[in-house]
Design a protein with these regions (language model features):
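N-terminal export/assembly segments and adjacent metallocofactor-ligating motifs
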Residues: 1-238, 267, 275, 393, ...
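Flexible, glycine/charged-enriched surface loops at secondary-structure junctions
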Residues: 94-98, 241-246, 293, 324-331, ...
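Extended redox/cofactor-interaction regions of prokaryotic respiratory oxidoreductases
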Residues: 114-191, 197-202, 226-229, 315-429, ...
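Short beta-alpha connecting loops at secondary-structure transitions
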Residues: 211-219, 441-448, 457-468
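Internal, active-site/partner-interface "lid" segment
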Residues: 242-262, 493-510
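Catalytic, metal-anchored helix/loop core of enzyme active sites in primary metabolism
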Residues: 432
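Long, contiguous, secondary-structure-rich segments that constitute the structural scaffold
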Residues: 463-545, 551, 629-647, 651-752
Length: 752
């Protein structure tokens, strides 16, 4: 019997609404939901392949427990017993920081990943937290924290109303957008062009996005912050800086101008390989546009000056009067955000509240660099204990972190490891307990994180499209039970975790004079919550307490879970609106243009004015049909353009004697890999490009299709000690490499 069901796609940040076709409990098709209030029918190849991913035969169907050195199928009870027996003794003997927690990118794509890891981390009490953020967007969190007082307060470009959009290090035609949730990003960019707007792309590669642009500038990798600083300098130098209506809420303008005095267009031109007059033109056009927005992403984050580049993106939006302005860059307001507080001074944002044990990296946003995980496991010091047990949730750092070989060995030395993962992959193969969540069609979905980054305010929720298969456990229950096992409450009802969070949240809300439930009885409020499960009751609570909520009866027209369920295609909450100064949490209550940590890092950027790479440098590459290391086991999403090839410019290929399709050895500070060359002028001379997330050739995994064409692990080329010092983010782009023909190719050539 065939039927359809709605499901929000969890496979990238666009969060498109899908209509799934289901036959006999199995997803057999997916199409875009034309009635979805946000995505309006858009679908990409990943969403279209939802059914293939959902039914991948290599997905684990039940838990695995290591017995006598081998992972064997086990019951859930055996798995929880083993988990509690492995984690608690480490905490009790060595302390909470000896237990590390690693969170992968898929956590932000699930309800469970949003709701339970914070409880797990707090329950253990560990400072040893490592996530995918420090190989991705942590610089943006840090710059936002320093500018606005809240690391999660990230302005997004108002794509649908802007007249001028400048993208740096971003390729949304392949990524579908990142830190900017926008279904049909390609269509929105085409609409910008159609209404007479201007699109500028700054990227060392001529990406699909660059090919759509009015102007593409192939910047030298790693010099993004220099270019942006020179643009800001031009605005000051030519009297073009105009803060507009937000001027009363901004401080530090004169200090910023002085700090950027050395970064003239002439001073940075050679380093960036963009001439001074072009830099001035970029700044002038930005200032002259009726509305404009600058947007930077992973290419400008994963470089030595990632935090400075992220900061300067928002500095340019401020200096042109486009921050918090329709058509500029605005702050979304999600339905599950906390109740808005009156504007005023906040607590500010702090870095370095604790440090890593080995190299003393400062924490950022509660996290330590993922690049430091291996050394935190394998290197003893006189201070503190090494990480002896590891909880990995949807994480594959052996592929996603620099120097995966070292981490691979380090994981084998742990006293205990538990992995929540649907696959036995390059990382989870080391676990003593593997806890597989069900396929996504069997899970509910609400986007807690991505709604705070969406280009339009809206709220959507979908319940599981198909019921849990026999023997499977909901991911929410898996993580709730993991909380209990790790905190000494093994055997308790997992619903107790949700009840505890609800009770604590409501108790705090009724004490808050700005809350809609101030002074009320928290137990009576809890009794009003609806939902079929603990996670749904928590969602209902967050909606009711949020900026659009009913306030538990205070606003009869406000949001509740019941109202959301009555609108299966979502509820549109309107375009983004100016919000300053209300969301600011800086100590001044204003946008602080030149925070002290930023000012202290500027001398390092000045030194970069004289730096020039002597040879080839490496950059990464996005694929539309992939997302990090996730999807290489789905035949429908591999092959074609989604291949692990090394892009080499024809001039470099000729100089080095590299032929198209030839296996090439790539050598970096961290090691070497071999990949087939793809000779193309899509990269600028002196730059080679290799995508990330590949390298599925390690023994002991169960990902059959991925192993057929495993690709090369680009992170093995990288120096794990090379980080952006403010954020701890890994430097993945602009790193020096050398090329040489593979042994087989060299032998073939010598035989000719």
């Amino acid at each position: 019997m065939s039927r359809t069901a709605l499901r929000i796609c969890p496979l990238c940040e666009a969060t498109c609404g899908l209509v799934l076709t289901i036959d006999d409990g199995r997803v057999t098709g997916a199409r875009g939901d034309r009635e979805d209030v946000f995505s309006k029918g858009f679908i990409c190849p990943k969403g279209a392949a939802f059914g293939a991913l959902d039914s991948d035969p290599d997905r684990l169907r039940g838990p695995l427990v290591r017995v006598d050195g081998e992972l064997r199928e086990a019951t859930w009870e055996e798995a929880w017993d083993a988990g509690a027996a492995g984690i608690r003794p480490v905490v009790e003997r060595y302390g909470p920081h000896a237990v590390g927690v690693v969170l992968g990118n898929p956590n932000v794509h699930t309800m469970a990943g949003a709701l339970y890891p914070p409880v797990l981390i707090a329950g253990i009490g560990t400072h040893s937290l490592f996530t995918a953020s420090t190989v991705d967007q942590m610089p943006k969190h840090v710059s936002s924290g320093l500018l606005f007082g809240d690391a999660n307060l990230i302005p997004v470009p108002d794509l649908d109303r802007t007249d001028h959009l400048l993208l740096i290090g971003a390729n949304p035609l392949e990524s579908n957008g990142s830190l900017c949730t926008a279904p049909d990003f390609p269509g929105r960019l085409k609409a910008l062009r159609a209404r007479g707007g201007t699109l500028t792309v700054i990227d060392p590669r001529r990406t699909r996005t660059a090919r759509l642009a009015d102007r593409h500038l192939a910047i030298r990798p790693g010099t993004d912050a220099l270019l942006l600083a020179a643009m800001a300098h031009t605005l000051f130098d030519e009297g073009l800086a105009d803060l507009g209506e937000r001027a009363p809420h901004i401080q530090g303008l004169d200090e910023l101008a002085a700090a950027l005095d050395d970064f003239t267009p002439e001073a940075v031109a050679s380093a960036c390989d963009i001439d001074a007059e072009t830099i001035r033109t970029l700044a002038r056009e930005l200032a002259a546009a009726p509305t404009a927005a600058v947007y930077g992403r992973i290419g400008s984050c994963t470089v030595p000056h990632g935090t400075l580049a992220s900061w300067l993106v928002d500095v340019l939006n401020v200096l042109t009067g486009n921050l918090d302005r329709p058509g500029g860059a605005l702050f979304p307001q999600a339905a599950t955000d906390r109740t808005p507080r009156p504007a005023g001074p906040g607590r500010g944002f702090a870095l370095g509240r604790w440090h890593s044990r080995v190299r003393r990296h400062p924490e950022a946003k509660g996290e330590l660099p993922l690049s430091a995980l291996a050394e935190e496991i394998d290197t003893p010091t006189d201070e503190g204990e090494p990480v002896r047990a590891l909880v990995a949730v949807a994480a594959n750092p052996v592929l996603s972190a620099p120097d995966g070989n070292r981490l691979d060995k380090a994981l084998g030395s742990l006293d205990f490891m538990v992995s929540v993962d649907p696959y036995l992959n390059e990382t989870s193969r080391h676990a003593d307990v593997v806890l597989p969540p069900p396929p996504p069609a069997q899970s509910p979905h609400h986007d807690f994180a991505f709604n705070t980054l969406a280009v339009r305010n809206q709220v959507r929720y979908t319940r599981p499209a198909v019921p849990l298969e026999p023997g499977r456990m909901a991911e929410t229950e898996i993580l709730a039970r993991l909380v209990l096992a790790a905190t000494g409450m093994h055997g308790a009802d997992p619903a107790a975790v949700d009840t505890l969070v609800i009770d604590q949240t409501l108790a705090k809300a009724v004490r808050d004079p700005h809350s809609p439930v101030h002074g009320r009885d928290p137990q009576q409020l809890a009794a009003q919550l609806t939902g079929d499960s603990g996670p749904e009751r928590r969602l209902d609570m967050m909606l009711r307490l949020g900026p659009y909520g009913d306030g538990f009866g205070a606003d009869r027209d406000g949001l509740t879970l019941d109202r959301l369920l009555a609108h299966p295609h979502g509820i549109d909450l309107g375009p983004l609106r100016p919000r300053l100064p209300q969301p600011l949490k800086t100590r001044s209550g204003k946008v602080e243009l030149l925070p002290e940590p930023i000012a202290a890092d500027l001398p390092r950027l000045r030194a970069a004015l004289d730096e020039r790479p002597g040879g080839l440098v490496l950059v990464g590459r996005r694929h539309l049909r992939s997302n990090n290391s996730w999807m290489h086991n789905v035949p429908a999403l591999t092959g074609g353009s989604n291949r692990c090839t090394l892009h080499v410019h024809p001039d470099d290929a000729e100089r080095l004697g590299v032929r198209d399709g030839q296996p090439v050895r790539v050598k970096g500070a961290g090691g070497e890999v071999t990949a087939p060359a793809e000779v193309t002028d899509a990269v600028r001379p002196g730059v080679v490009s290799l995508p990330h997330g590949w390298g599925h050739d390690r023994p002991g995994t169960r990902m059959g299709h991925a192993a057929v064409d495993p690709g090369a692990n680009v992170n093995q080329l990288l120096d794990g000690s090379l980080l952006d010092p403010l954020s701890g983010n890994a430097v993945l782009n602009g790193v020096p490499v050398e090329l040489a023909p593979s042994a087989a190719a060299a032998a073939e050539r010598s035989a000719l």
